[in-house]
C-alpha cells in the first residue's frame, strides 16, 4: 500500500556504524581542533547517568541536505536563489539586503511567502522568517543531532590524530616570520550513531500563511525534496572534511515511513526485533485512533532480513 505524494509525511530513523570521522568540529585551541560533543543521558543498571559523547549537529546535516537539494533543483530546472547556488544558505530576514534581484520586496503576508518560495526551493523546503513582513515559514525538513545509540554509548570514542604541514628548508628560511611548517592535532570520532527526522512533503510548494496558495510544479518540488533526502541519508552526503577525513560508514539499519498525518519513528536502538514490534504496534494504534490508513514502513537491515534489500529501496514508501 502506498500513499499519495501530495498527502504524505515522511519519517526516518537510521543507524550508522561510522569509523574515523571528523564531520563536525566546534573550535580550535592553538593547534588542537576539537570534535563536537553533546551530553547523553542513559540508564545504567538501576539509575540514570550522563556522559559526553561525539555528536554531529542537525544544522550540519541540514546543510548537506540543502546543498543536495540545490544540485537536484538545478538539474531539474527548479528555482534556486543565487546565494544558494554558491553554497551560501542565507534565508530571508528583516531588512533583507543580501538577496539581490528579488521581486518580493513590496509583497506582504501570504503573497510575500509565495513570492519567496517561487524564487527559491531551498526556502520553500527549509523555511525562513522575516519579522518585518510578519511572515514565518517553518522548515518542512527536520534532522536530529546524530549521536551514539543508547545501547552503544560505551563503545563510542574520540581520539586526536597528529598531522604535519611540511615545508622545505628553503621556504622556511624565506618566510621566517610565518608559520609555514606546522604541527596540529585533529580529533576524530567513531561510534554506532543514530539519526532521526522527518520531511513534510505535503507542505512543500505551498504557503503556510493564509490564504494558502500553491506554486507551479509543486509535484516536481516534492520529488526533488524526497530525492535529496534519499541521497543525503543513503550516500552519507553531509558533514565537514570529507576530502581528507572521509569516514568508513556502514548503514546498520534504515527505517522510512510514509503517513497521512505526522507519524515519527523512534530512534533505532536496542534489540532490532523488539524495535520492529514496537513500530508495527505503534503504526496500528496510530491508524486506528485517527481513522486513517496505516503508515507504510519500509526498512533495510544489515544483519537481519528487512522488507527491502537495500537502503535506497526503503524510499519506495514514496
UniProtKB/Swiss-Prot annotation:
Keyword Magnesium part of the UniProt annotation: no
Pfam name, any one: DevR
BP GO terms, sorted: defense response to virus
Keyword entries, A-Z: Antiviral defense
Source superkingdom: Archaea
Remaining remarks: The aCascade complex was purified from strain P1.
Family: Belongs to the CRISPR-associated protein Cas7/Cst2/DevR family. Subtype I-a/Apern subfamily.
Subunit and partners: Part of the aCascade ribonucleoprotein complex, minimally composed of Csa2 and Cas5a, which binds crRNA. Other possible components of aCascade in strain P1 are Cas6b (SSO1437) and Csa5 (SSO1443), while SSO1399, Cas5b (SSO1400) and SSO1401 have sometimes been seen weakly associated. Csa2 is probably the major RNA-binding subunit. The Csa2-Cas5a-crRNA complex also binds target DNA homologous to crRNA, probably forming an R-loop. Purified aCascade forms a filament about 6 nm in width.
Function: CRISPR (clustered regularly interspaced short palindromic repeat) is an adaptive immune system that provides protection against mobile genetic elements (viruses, transposable elements and conjugative plasmids). CRISPR clusters contain spacers, sequences complementary to antecedent mobile elements, and target invading nucleic acids. CRISPR clusters are transcribed and processed into CRISPR RNA (crRNA).
Protein's name according to its UniProt entry: CRISPR-associated protein Cas7/Csa2 1
Native species: Saccharolobus solfataricus (strain ATCC 35092 / DSM 1617 / JCM 11322 / P2) (Sulfolobus solfataricus)
